[in-house]
Swiss-Prot record:
HAMAP family noted in UniProt: RNApol_bact_RpoZ
Protein name: DNA-directed RNA polymerase subunit omega
The entry's keywords: DNA-directed RNA polymerase, Nucleotidyltransferase, Transcription, Transferase
Organism, as annotated: Brevibacillus brevis (strain 47 / JCM 6285 / NBRC 100599)
Transmembrane domains' residue ranges: none
Gene Ontology cellular-component annotations: DNA-directed RNA polymerase complex
Length: 68
């Protein structure tokens, strides 16, 4: 079984498009030597790490108009 599950991710995100955008930008940061925010990550890939951060509330996004 995959972690985090797609059901958990879609419940937490406003839309799947926002989820993909946030995860891809964070994965790019991780690839460029940013520090992982999850204590014991299950994934070794950057996108998986970004999704783990998102589901554990370590990765928070904010819209330019101030929405969260």
């Amino acid at each position: 079984m995959l972690y985090p599950s797609i059901d958990e991710l879609t419940e937490k995100a406003e839309s799947k498009y926002i989820l993909v955008t946030v995860a891809s930008k964070r994965a790019r940061q991780l690839r460029e030597n940013s520090e992982v925010q999850v204590v014991r990550p299950k994934s070794k890939k950057f996108v998986g790490l970004a999704l783990e951060e998102f589901i554990s509330d370590e990765l928070v996004h904010e819209f330019l108009d101030g929405r969260k």
